[in-house]
């Protein structure tokens, strides 16, 4: 469903040259879900780096309470069998992981302590099989976003959370988000 009925919802093409017209006294949450414009390096740069610069240009003078940036566990270089944690040093070797990490750093410089980064594992829904050992159902991704919109944690710095469901083969830790009280639901 591409329709969202709400007077408090704004949709905008973040690669557009059009200016975003917002007259707001307070914005509780902005959720940015970047998407590559194509699957090559240029598409990733457009979808992550250029689009987030455009959004920042439009929002930098607005009173935003929290900015939720959707990211990916692709930033982890998973050549070993160790479990990846949010505090691990990032050493992405392929262009997608490097660009996504650059995007995260850019977002942190833009939004500072207002920023929450959610690193999603491979998205699936009920019509798709879980295709990797690290995954998250689309509904759990939406629930994680909702969790951070509804809770007021008052973080003192940018916070990053891995969003990956429990599985016997998972190499991505989800302990940090679960320690705040988030529960992953089970979907077929």
Give the positions of each predicted feature:
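NAD(P)-cofactor binding segment of oxidoreductase domains
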Residues: 27-30, 37-68
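C-terminal amphipathic/interface module of NAD(P)-dependent oxidoreductases
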Residues: 171-188
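Conserved Rossmann-fold NAD(P)-dependent oxidoreductase catalytic core, especially the SDR/UDP-sugar
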Residues: 54-93
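Conserved beta-loop-beta element that borders a ligand/cofactor-binding pocket
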Residues: 72, 103-126
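A recurrent short beta-strand within the Rossmann-like NAD(P)-dependent oxidoreductase core
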Residues: 145-148, 152-169, 173-175
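Flexible, glycine-rich beta-alpha linker
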Residues: 77-80, 91, 95, 116-132
